[in-house]
Regions:
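Histidine-centered, transition-metal-coordinating active-site segments
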Residues: 5, 10-11, 15-227
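Active-site-proximal cofactor/substrate-binding loop regions of enzyme domains
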Residues: 1
Length: 227
């Protein structure tokens, strides 16, 4: 199909703009009608960027014109905080999840802890979500300013890069995850292509997509009923 590639920040903006509703005092469901600042924070929050400091931008941008994740910095300081938080949040959480799923073991985490303690003036007794999040929050609070933006110290940035490198090498890019990723992509792409076909059928016959699906419900009872 001719649809653009999926990326979750832009999809999230589309969802709150076009799909999500909220019930008002009269029990009528209405669009969320979010402010520009909140919508901007949603689409610009991607934390998978190698940035030590995040400065807010000063120019207004039409948010639907974003072409790729991380294209622009957020418009507000609050958005910058969210972007930095997104970067911090997944580092230790992914390590904890990988331990729970036996993707990595305690020896690997212990080695990571030793390597981090070699470059950090703060001594880590453990690598877990609470410890790591607390470390980075304190560092951001101590090093951020109007001039520098929402900022990490040089030391904390090195700790962050060390953890990101560990995660990519031992979690994200290993064969076991690649096999699972390919499996999930196959399932999601198959479901998408199946439903997208009915979007085309609905347009050609000038009917609602739901009506088009109901026409073939007996052929595909599990797929369509689940949808």
């Amino acid at each position: 199909n001719d649809l653009p590639a999926f990326w979750h920040e832009k999809n999230s903006l589309y969802f709150v703009d076009e799909i999500e509703t909220l019930e008002d005092d009269h029990h009528i469901r209405r669009n969320l009608n979010l402010t520009y600042a909140i919508r901007d924070g949603i689409i610009s929050h991607c934390g998978e960027m190698n940035q030590k400091s995040i400065q807010k931008r000063n120019e207004y941008i039409e948010l639907k014109d974003y072409q790729y994740p991380g294209q622009y910095n957020p418009y507000t300081w609050e958005g910058c905080v969210v972007k930095m938080s997104d970067k911090i949040a997944y580092l230790a959480r992914d390590i904890e999840d990988a331990l729970r799923l036996n993707i990595i073991d305690e020896k690997q985490v212990e080695q990571l802890k030793k390597e981090i303690n070699m470059i950090s003036s703060y001594h880590f007794d453990a690598i877990n979500n609470g410890t790591i999040v607390n470390y980075f929050i304190l560092d951001v609070c101590q090093n951020s300013s109007l001039e520098k933006g929402i900022c990490l110290s040089d030391e904390a940035f090195e700790v962050m890069k060390k953890m990101m490198s560990f995660n990519y090498k031992n979690i994200y890019l290993i064969d076991r995850i690649e096999v699972h990723t390919n499996y999930v992509q196959l399932i999601l792409n198959s479901i998408f292509q199946f439903l997208y076909k009915y979007e085309t059928i609905a347009k050609e016959n000038q009917i609602n997509v739901i009506e088009a699906l109901k026409e073939d419900q007996k052929k595909y009872p599990i797929t369509i009923q689940g949808y």
